[in-house]
Amino acid sequence: MDCVTSHNPVATFRCEVKMKPGKILFLLLLTGSVWSLISHPGKTQEAPSPTQLNTQSPAPNAQELTQVTGVRVVPTVQGLEVILDSTAAEKLQVSTQNQGNSLIADITNAQLNLSEGNTFSQNNPATGVTNVTVVNHNDNTIRVTVTGEKSLPKFELFDSDTGLILAFTATEVAQDSPAEVDEPIELVVTATRTETPIQNVPRSITVIDREQIAAQASTSRNLIEILGKTVPGLAPPAQGASNFGLTLRGRNPQVLIDGVPQSTTRNASRDLRTIDAAAIERIEVVRGPSAIYGDGATGGVINIITRRPTEEKLTSRTEVGVSAALGNLEGDSFSTNLQHFISAKQGNFDFTFNFAVAKNGGFFDAQGDRIPSDPNAQGGFADASSINLFGKFGIDIDANQRLQLTFNRFDEKQDTDIASDPRVNTIPGRQKARALEGLSLDERPGNENTFINLQYTHDDLFNSKLQAQLYYRDYLTRFFPFDGRSFASLGNEIFQSRVESEKYGGRLQIETPLFNQGAAKLLWGVDYSQEDTSQPVSVFDQAAFVASGGLAFRKTGDRSWTPPLELRSLGLFAQLNWEISDRFVFNGGVRYENADVSVNDFRTLANPNVTIGGGDLNFNATLFNVGAVYALNPQLSVFANYAQGFSLSDIGLALRNAPPGFSVESLNPEPQKVDNYEIGIRGQWDTVQASLSAFYNESDLGTTFTAPGTVIRAPERIYGLEAAIDAQPSSTWQVGGTFTLIGGEIDSNNDGDYESLDGFRIPPLKLTAYVENETLPGWRNRLQALYSGNREVFGNNNTAFGRRPVESYLTVDYISSIKLGAGTLQLGLENLFNSQYFPVVSQLQANDSAYAAARGRTLSIKYSFDW
């Protein structure tokens, strides 16, 4: 046989399956000790996989074991042959499965009986193949494992008079053959929590791989900007530290790192300033509400998957870079970065380590003026220094079990003497935010994020695949001081707040094959987390602030703003994935979520002398999803889904605005439950990949934020269109782009009369486009553009927060890379034509001191090399 029968809905046959990294995570201790599982691995026969391959004969009686008396490995032009010597080869039955770059063939009703022991192993037997192992998997099964150097080997099966021949072809060798080779299947994990071909998922998904991340980092290492330029459905990017206003389909996304939640109960909107881009392997974005990972994904899920170990024995790579504003080559604008990546694999142990340090200079707009360090009153990273330490350690306990520990520490501090001049707020007309030197502030804005993540997987535990995870996260973010003298709800104070959060939790999931040779699988499990959160503030002397023109912040004391609260959350879920035929895939599931919140007695910033009674809150939600994919032909498929997402209302925000006489029990917040309906079409041809989707979602209770810190709980509805296309007209040219159009309304008075949602929720039209060319071998050039349209739904004279008119803008970047010496030189020109424009988030600000322009033309150069 040349090919393996598959349940893939867009192709009847598939000869190659490429397993990508990013395994789903597990809650280890909820099922007892990991060492118990290690010492008692499952011995049952594996369930057939969708890539199962059988020989000609029906299975013999289990007690009539076929004896294999010899093993030979013979190199071939395409790879190698593993020959199992037996006089009854025609009775042998073979099934295959994939694990990373290893292809595993199990031969049932057979026993290895060699003259010199019952284990055969050979390293580097052929080009592109690192190891061949043949062992007795259990009492009636022989297991043959062939590991490819860079990718999964291909497999063919033959009989001979003297034995069974298993022919393996290294993929990298096969690609040089004139024979036609299928493209590897792209696997994603975020949409279903299991490794699933992207064409089997009835959702809109964007995957940004390591190569794309590195290219976009040539102009900006800020994840907010990288995602905003590449993901349809996401709002146009801002150039600050906050993802406030960076909505996905008009609602907040849930941000995960390897499945570890990065959000906090008191939403700090810093979820994407928690890890450096250098530590990321790829980013998977599921667009649209989802409850599969629990609370927070009303807009979708952004799952950041960290660097994986390489297959080489040792990989070491260093990168150095510098950037500066090109307007006048201002000395203060120079930024530098350094990173080093190392990965090693020895036997069944591997590790990955990444170190990244960056020092940013000042940012300058297209007119040569310095941009305030806090451009939109939500945080910035100009004049900031950051360091990121990442480590991942893994051990393959056996062919079925793996234990992996991941650690990441991100620390960023904004050491600046630049503030935003408050005097521009008194000048008539719209004024650009103005930088003011001389800032005096002891505690600098910044972010600190530490997480530890333990993962365990067992691929054959009683015919099921178990995945478990334990995680711990410690987080602190400190904001720039805020002038709240005109807001009674803020105590008419000038203050600086910080959010402190400590969270731990775990996940356990089991994937069990049900019927039809594993074409139907049930994923079921449990998630648990506990978080302690608070938001204290430092209060400053108002007289000193006024006398200094808004530059001096002399601390007079500490107060509580959001009281300490504890959130405990438990989620139970089940998800069915059924490949009904080669054309039709069905998904459906349910999740039950229960959460408890405990709050002690507290005092607010507005009423520091009044004690408000604490208490306990409980809320729960049951969420459903159902979807299907139908392949019209091997290249084109349509999909539809209904999914619910939910979000616990920002309890901390409600508590900090609590009036006298209020009690926690009287708050009784209900989760926001979002119903989402989506249809779409996907095409995957040799030189063109395209998708188009339409969606509509609604919720009875919204979470619309209004200044100076309140939330409107009212019915909302949001709808839109998204499209993406990539094409390769030739081997040296690539072109593509995305389209995003979103609308949304809110019934503020709950009277059936809907009005437009504000601009922080609903972005204007967004278009992106790129053209890339390999001009010479090893030299690539790319032009990319982003267009943000206008939006004037509240009238041209509206100056309220989030309701100001938004003007359109166009920005173009240039990215180039060339092989130079022992490494690669990359050059990036952000805002190539030096356009003076204001990001959407800036245009929506009520105060001109937060109306900051975007960066002007900025040059970045970096050089990376292996050693």
Swiss-Prot record:
Keywords assigned by UniProt, alphabetized? Cell outer membrane, Ion transport, Iron, Iron transport, Membrane, TonB box, Transmembrane, Transmembrane beta strand, Transport
Where along the sequence does the record place the motif called TonB box? 185-192
Report motif location: TonB C-terminal box: 850-867
Any GO BP: siderophore-dependent iron import into cell
Task: Give the principal location in a single coarse category.
Answer: membrane
Null allele outcome, as annotated, is:
Viable. Significantly decreased growth rate in liquid BG11 medium, but grows similarly to wild-type in iron- or copper-deficient BG11 medium. In iron- and copper-deficient BG medium, shows a much more pronounced retardation of growth compared to wild-type. Significantly decreased growth on media supplemented with ferric chloride, but grows similarly to wild-type on media supplemented with non-toxic concentrations of iron ammonium citrate (FeACi). Shows reduced chlorophyll fluorescence in BG11 medium similarly to wild-type in iron- and copper-deficient BG11 medium.
Q: How does this chain sit within the bilayer?
A: Multi-pass membrane protein
Query: Localized where?
Result: Cell outer membrane
Which Gene Ontology terms of cellular component type are present?
cell outer membrane
Among Gene3D superfamilies, the record links this protein to:
2.60.40.3500, TonB-dependent receptor, beta-barrel domain, TonB-dependent receptor, plug domain
Specify the TBDR plug domain's residue ranges.
197-307
Q: How does biotechnology exploit this protein, per its UniProt record?
A: Useful as a bioreporter in an application to sense bioavailability of iron in natural freshwaters, especially in eutrophic lakes with high iron. The application includes the V.fischeri luxAB genes fused to the promoter of this gene, and determination of dose-response relationships between luciferase activity and free ferric ion (Fe3+) concentrations to assess iron availability in water quality samples.
Where, if anywhere, are coiled coils annotated? none
CDD domains xrefs: ligand_gated_channel
What this protein is reported to do is described as:
Involved in the TonB-dependent uptake of iron in complex with schizokinen, a dihydroxamate-type siderophore.
The family line of this record is: Belongs to the TonB-dependent receptor family.
Designated name of the protein: Schizokinen transporter SchT
Gene name, Swiss-Prot/TrEMBL: schT
